[in-house]
Amino acid sequence: MEEISKSKQDGNSWEPTGNPKVLWTALIAFTYGFSVWAINSSLAPYLKDWYGYSASEVLIVAAMSPLFAAVTSLVLGIASDLWGGRIIFTLLLLFLPLPMIGYMFADSYVAFLCVGIFMGLGGASFIIGNTHVAVWYPKERQGAALGLYAFGNVGVAVGMLLVPFLLNTVLGGAPGTDLPPKLSLGPFEGWRLIFPVYGLLSLILAFVYWTVTSEPPIRNKKITFASIGSVYKSSTLPWILAYLYGATFGALMFNSAFLPTYLVDQYDIEKQKAIMVFVPIFVLLVAGSRPFSGWLGDKYNPIILLVYCLGAEVVLAAALSMQLAFPWQMSLLYAIAIFYGTGASLVVKIIPLYFKEVGAVTGLAKTAGASTGAVMTIVMSAVKGTTGEYTYGWLIWAGAIALGLILALRVQQRS
């Protein structure tokens, strides 16, 4: 594969034709970022046992990462438009070890909430790499390129697999529990040693990203704070696309935070099996569907395809509210996962077709997606706490997707 695909240059004009180095480096860094995001969800069932927290309490801890990602994604998207993905992604990777240091000292519920918030920056990495990759590829190839980049969603599965593997085979857990520490480093032992490993990897990736990637030879000078502000005011389309991203990509955020605790609480699945088997399969189905669906968005009308995806999601989400026997419930979850990933890729494909401020609009969409993850996890926690079951939570989710379907049909009619 060429180091950098040749781009057409003539004076001040420049047309992107691709940059594999940026694409693959961004994919690796994004995968790492999402594996960081998964740490809270992976630890939640263990914290429930070690500290005696309720299912509702650990769901709130798991919701902190997507909540902060929602707050920061819009800012990082705008920053990537203005100053480029290379410097913004490098700075993010340099910052991520700081909350990990905090996790090494956390020993109360409030402390876990606080450090869990800042781990959400790993999830916010998506918007930076998405913007960086998009500027290097022409519109007719952006669907495939961004779909491949979005395979980095698999980082959630990596985190789900790596954390319990390290706990159970290498590091151990917490003192005085059924999973005692196996290794120690000064005052730190067992599960807390996950964070120095992750922090060191973040610093290495920061060096690699800055060294290997590059910015386009001619940046889009037309993108300014004023132009970014005007795009939010120009029409309702950025806000509709943001909602649609919440109904697709947001589902990954919601389910990756919610499912480990849900499977243990609702179906009495052993926590290691829930985290290392059932949830990673769900994430792999979401991530695996994104490259192909991005390619489909290049070949066919992405808005029409999105309408069909959302229709399927509504039906499957309503079926999940029936709380079927475990094999059937997992079959429904795995089926809907494919439509989540497909729909998310289609929304990402649609954005550059309408807007040059890809980072700003995608940042708004990512904010909606991460907010969906946080809000729906909290909704499920509240529903469980008040009714003793999750049925109404799934119905609320089906209703939210149905609204997205109505909005997508409006966009289709206008286009």
Predicted regions and their residues:
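Glycine-rich segments within core transmembrane alpha-helices of 12-TM secondary carriers
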Residues: 143-171, 366-376
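C-terminal transmembrane helical hairpin of 12-TM major facilitator-type secondary transporters
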Residues: 300-347
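Extracytoplasmic gate region of multi-pass secondary transporters
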Residues: 40-44, 236-291
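Cytoplasmic helix-loop-helix junction between adjacent transmembrane helices
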Residues: 115-152
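C-terminal membrane-cytosol helix-exit motif in multi-pass small-molecule transporters
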Residues: 168-172, 199-219, 407-412
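Extracytoplasmic
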Residues: 21-53, 76, 255-260, 376
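Central cavity-lining transmembrane alpha-helices of secondary-active solute carriers
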Residues: 60-77, 280-292
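Conserved MFS/SLC helix-loop-helix module at the cytosolic interface between two early adjacent transmembrane helices
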Residues: 71-109
